[in-house]
């Protein structure tokens, strides 16, 4: 469905159709709310071969999980719009308008931002050919499949050190390569931990990833050295998939993640967030759980006060 205006004001408007957004849509619909999901169709894990550790769906392809979620949404009456949201505007004191590319508008009483994030990729020939199979960005997601393997972490500074330390859960054969960038190991703690775990740091620029099919043979460095490895993990940086959250005024951390409470509330009234756009581990199953949690909070915010009990007052014991 293309960008268009919708006359209805939905109870719940969701931006993003990944695990967080679809999970929130499913649960909001189960509470009999009218729900719309607007999705750009450009997920972060576009080339990932499988999702690991998702209860009941081990090894499912991300596209298949999304398709299954969309089918379930349709069965529950959720409106699915394939479009890009350019901005979100306030309508009155309570509602929102989702302004779509092409001029359409969608109206909602509550907003869930599940837009995800994007990874900064190193400019490295051959990397795209092995991404999702033997090149990764998430040790939590793909560390188990890397157990006992030779791994090169591409990155520098705290990010690279943290990723390398995380990967020691599964292997002790790790090298950090900064790909020509300064190491930025300014804190003695970084050097001490890397030295104790025998993790060397190379600063030479990588010329190319040598591969066959989806298997990596080595990384060819600018000085002619060939760095043997089985897998590559890279951590150059991340950024929000778009600037909707910033434009709306949501409070964010230093890396651009939207700060939420345990129920998914953002700093903006009636606006919620879930999934990778929020701080913490970036796992599909966590995103889905956050979406469900946010849906419950959204439902409670939509229930009239006449259908709620007053909060229970807890007695304070005296000693």
Where on the chain are the PLM-derived regions?
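FAD-binding core/adjacent interface of flavoenzyme oxidoreductases
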Residues: 1-13, 78-149, 231-233, 258-262, ...
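FAD-site-proximal beta/loop scaffold in flavoenzymes
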Residues: 2, 129-145, 236-285, 293, ...
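Beta1-alpha1 glycine-rich phosphate/pyrophosphate-binding loop at the start
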Residues: 3-4, 10-67, 159-184
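Residue-level detector of alpha-helix initiation sites
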Residues: 18-20, 117-119, 158-159, 278
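A Rossmann-like FAD-binding core segment of flavoenzymes
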Residues: 67-100, 105-107, 171-258, 303-319
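Glycine/Thr-rich phosphate-binding loops of Rossmann-like dinucleotide-binding domains
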Residues: 121-122, 162, 229, 242-243, ...
């Amino acid at each position: 469905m293309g960008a268009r205006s919708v006359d209805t004001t939905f109870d719940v408007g969701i931006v993003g159709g990944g695990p967080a957004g679809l999970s929130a849509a499913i649960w909001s619909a189960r509470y009999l709310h009218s729900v719309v999901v607007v999705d750009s169709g450009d997920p972060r894990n576009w080339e990932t071969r499988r999702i690991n550790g998702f209860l009941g769906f081990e090894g499912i392809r991300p596209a298949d999980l999304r398709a299954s979620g969309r089918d379930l949404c349709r069965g529950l009456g959720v409106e699915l719009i394939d479009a890009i949201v350019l901005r979100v505007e306030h309508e009155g004191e309570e509602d929102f308008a989702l302004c779509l590319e092409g001029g359409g508008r969608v109206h909602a009483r509550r907003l869930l931002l599940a837009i995800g994030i994007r990874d900064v990729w190193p400019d490295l020939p051959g990397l795209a050919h092995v991404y999702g199979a033997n090149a990764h960005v998430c040790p939590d997601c793909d560390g188990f499949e890397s157990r006992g393997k030779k791994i090169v972490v591409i990155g520098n500074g705290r990010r690279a050190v943290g990723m390398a330390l995380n990967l020691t859960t599964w292997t002790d054969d790790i090298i950090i390569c900064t790909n020509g960038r300064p190491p930025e190991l300014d804190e003695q703690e970084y050097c001490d931990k890397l030295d104790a775990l025998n993790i060397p740091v190379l600063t030479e620029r990588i010329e190319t990833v040598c591969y066959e099919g989806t298997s990596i043979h080595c990384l060819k460095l600018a000085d002619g050295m060939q760095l043997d490895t089985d897998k590559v993990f890279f951590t150059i940086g991340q950024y929000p998939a778009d600037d909707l959250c910033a434009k709306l005024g949501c409070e964010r951390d230093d890396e651009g993640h939207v700060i939420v409470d345990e129920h998914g509330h953002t700093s903006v009234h009636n606006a919620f967030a879930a999934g990778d756009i929020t701080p913490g581990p970036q796992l599909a199953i966590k995103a889905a759980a956050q979406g469900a949690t946010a849906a419950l909070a959204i439902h409670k915010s939509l229930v009239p006060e006449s259908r709620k009990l007053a909060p229970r007052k807890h007695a304070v014991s005296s000693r």
